[in-house]
Regions:
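N-terminal hydrophobic/helix-forming segments and targeting peptides
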Residues: 2-26, 40, 44-524
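Short, non-ligating residues that shape and space the ligands of small metal-coordination modules
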Residues: 31-32
Length: 524
């Protein structure tokens, strides 16, 4: 695969138009195998869409990131996107339930998923030897949302159909009121033969809204409302009770005990139609959630911003993934390059697909075991310990951009700006992994990669958030640092980042994976 073709696939350039190409890339890219696109030819590589991606120009990644946000609203869709991208680039999936012995080799490209909501991808250096280190980036792809309850059907209230939902992490806060909410997620289906499968679904129009109460009623709407009784989404109308006598019969869509009988009938019918399901009882269960439908967009006088939902943390996870895909593969690479994107960070990471589970260490250890067998080297605790001692983790999570309306909330010289670069994040109480050694390592990476690092630490009178870094670095004993991209309005249903920040992230994460072995050698 040529570098031009790789860049074309990485950034989804077949989805955008018009596509400006230099003559060289026009000959190399596989555009003839994609959907029709509008092409503009240029003699200058600096304006060629593919060349801009190949050279990590930040502006080349703005629209691809916005498209990713628009098309992948749930964690299930995000993992599906990453899986599709890896497969198209020749990565081999490693089923967790199978034996990996003999399946891995130096120069190989692999990925493994867990629960359809977490994914780990890695490449093995062509010069890899058992005991060599892993250059890894870890982040999370879950975001604040409102998930349907196990029984989401609710009695009609004053003619309104409502939906039973529960907040995931800090969702249903005041920013969720009066928003156009759609629905998506995973549906478990059993067909006529008894085979069970998982199907992804999302609707492209709003089906729900949480209405505020007008100020005329004298009740404030400043976030002090009851999330169980006052933040219940409305999804339709049913005024059939007007003028009727007696109770309305309960509508059922399946046999007694069917899952679909616990959900709003009209929603079941709608989801079934989207998935082409005729027999509603084939729906065994589902994990659906609400999301803000307003699309990600660029804004500002010179389009300096991205306004979008779910920036925390699709931003760092997408940039890390793209940086990983764009990283170089040289003959003398001796390390494993890896990106791990987890679910459940916003609620503590304690589930098996979260960073506190064994997903990352077990994947690394199984990979090292397979590679040791390939190299005829005995595998055991010694090789595992040596691997971790030679490794480094970048914990990638969004951090707080300085807010011009609240400057006093930030420490001097610790106030990151948008469209500048990656932030090295510190915390004296161990909520971040960064120390003097890891800071020096990443600062050197920035120097070699042409990146501008920023620094963030929260004030002593404010509460620091946490990341997956401490739990992963302590579990494996690896050196680590926290580094993330800045955003405004964290944990709002709609946030802001810089239009160059996705691309600046790609440049940094690619630089870390490409330069880490060189930097690590300077410490030996």
């Amino acid at each position: 695969m040529s570098d031009a073709e790789k860049a074309f696939i990485i950034a989804d350039l077949d989805r955008h138009g018009p596509l400006t190409l230099c003559d060289s890339c026009y000959r190399d890219i596989p555009y003839r195998r994609t959907d029709p696109i509008s092409l503009e030819l240029t003699d200058e590589s600096r304006s060629c869409s593919v060349c801009m991606v190949r050279t990590s120009k930040p502006e080349a990644f703005t629209e691809p990131f916005c498209t990713f946000l628009r098309e992948n609203p749930t964690v299930f869709h995000a993992v599906g996107y990453f899986t599709s991208k890896l497969t198209s680039l020749g990565y081999k999936e490693l089923p967790a339930r199978e034996d990996w012995t003999g399946k891995l080799e130096p120069g190989g490209k692999y990925f493994v998923t867990r629960n359809g909501t977490s994914i780990i991808a890695f490449t093995v250096g062509k010069a890899y030897k058992p005991g060599n280190g892993v250059a890894m980036i870890a982040g999370h792809i879950d975001a604040l949302t409102a998930r349907l309850k196990p029984v989401s059907n609710k009695p009609t209230s004053a003619g309104f159909l409502q939906l039973g939902v529960a907040p995931y992490a800090g969702a249903l806060n005041e920013t969720w009121w009066d928003r156009d909410l759609s629905i998506g997620g995973r549906v478990i289906v059993r067909d006529e033969s008894g085979k069970t499968s998982s199907k992804l679904v999302k609707l492209d129009w709003p089906i729900a809204r949480i209405p505020t109460l007008a100020p005329h009623f004298g009740v404030g709407m400043l976030g002090q409302n009851n999330k169980e009784t006052e933040a219940v989404p409305i999804i339709g109308l049913d005024n059939s009770d007007l003028g009727s006598s007696g109770a309305k019969p309960v509508e059922t869509l399946g046999p007694a005990g069917s899952f679909v009988n616990t959900q709003p009938p009209r929603l079941v019918q709608l989801i079934s139609k989207e998935l082409g399901i005729k027999d509603y009882s084939q729906i065994v269960n589902w994990e659906l959630e609400l999301f803000d439908l307003q699309p990600a967009t660029v804004g500002g006088l010179d389009k300096e911003f991205i306004f979008a939902g779910r920036i925390d943390d699709k931003l760092c996870s997408w940039a890390a993934f793209q940086g990983f895909l764009a990283s170089e593969a040289n003959e003398d690479d001796g390390a494993i390059k890896l990106v791990a994107l987890f679910d459940d960070e916003e609620i503590g990471s304690l589930l098996r697909q979260g960073a506190r589970g064994n997903f990352l260490p077990s994947t690394i250890e199984r990979a090292v075991e397979s590679l040791s067998v390939k190299d005829n080297k005995a595998f055991g605790p010694g090789v595992v310990g040596q691997t971790y001692a030679n490794s480094f983790l970048v914990s990638a999570d969004v951090t707080h951009s300085v807010n011009p309306n609240f400057l006093s909330r930030y420490l001097d010289n610790h106030a990151p700006r948008l469209n500048v670069g990656i932030c090295l994040c510190a915390d004296s109480n161990g909520h971040m992994t960064t120390d003097s050694v890891s800071t020096a390592i990443l600062t050197r990476v920035c120097e070699l990669s042409g990146c501008t690092p920023q620094v963030f630490q929260i004030r002593n009178d404010s509460r620091s958030g946490g990341t997956v870094g401490p739990m992963l670095s302590s579990a494996m004993g690896v050196k680590a640092a926290d580094a993330g991209l800045p955003q405004l309005s964290m944990h709002s249903i709609r946030a802001t980042t810089g239009s160059l920040d996705p691309g600046l992230g790609v440049k940094f994460f690619k630089g870390f994976l490409d330069k880490w072995e060189k930097v690590d050698a300077e410490w030996q």
